[in-house]
């Protein structure tokens, strides 16, 4: 099988959560060591409330490296503006634009269509 893309593995950790919007806490999530590799709080991060299947599906027929828009809207939480690593969070439901590489999502480009 093709190597399960390392960047896809990272993408899943950084941007996909199985938690519901109601249960999701930006501050506790963003203070996880995955998000603070150098001890710094990441200024902003968007989470997709979904299992991995529908997100990976966006890249299903994307060979090479290309930005793709989702055809469905996802519930999203954006964590931002940490003051001493305490985050504000905002929720919305929207399309997402991601970078695909050889059928795997590898980078979150933005909320909304590409």
Swiss-Prot record:
Keywords from the UniProt entry: Disulfide bond, Endonuclease, Glycoprotein, Hydrolase, Nuclease, Secreted
EC primary class: hydrolase
GO terms for cellular component: extracellular region
Active site as annotated: 15 (proton acceptor), 107 (proton donor)
SMART domains tied to this protein: RNAse_Pc (SM00092)
Function: Endonuclease, hydrolyzes highly polymerized RNA, poly(U) and poly(C), and the dinucleotides CpA and UpA. More active towards rCA than rUA or rUG. Has cytotoxic activity against cultured human submaxillary gland carcinoma cells.
Name of this chain's protein: Amphinase-3
């Amino acid at each position: 099988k093709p190597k399960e893309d390392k960047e896809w593995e990272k993408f899943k950790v950084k941007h996909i959560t199985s938690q519901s919007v109601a249960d999701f806490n930006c501050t506790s999530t963003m203070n996880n060591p995955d998000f603070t590799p150098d001890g710094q709080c990441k200024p902003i991060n968007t989470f997709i409330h979904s299992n991995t299947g529908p997100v990976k599906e966006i890249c299903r027929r994307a060979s090479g490296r290309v930005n793709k828009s989702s055809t469905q809207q996802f519930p999203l939480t954006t964590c931002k503006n940490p003051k001493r690593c305490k985050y504000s969070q905002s929720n919305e439901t929207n399309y997402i634009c991601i970078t695909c590489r050889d059928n795997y999502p590898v980078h979150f480009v933005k909320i909304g269509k590409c």
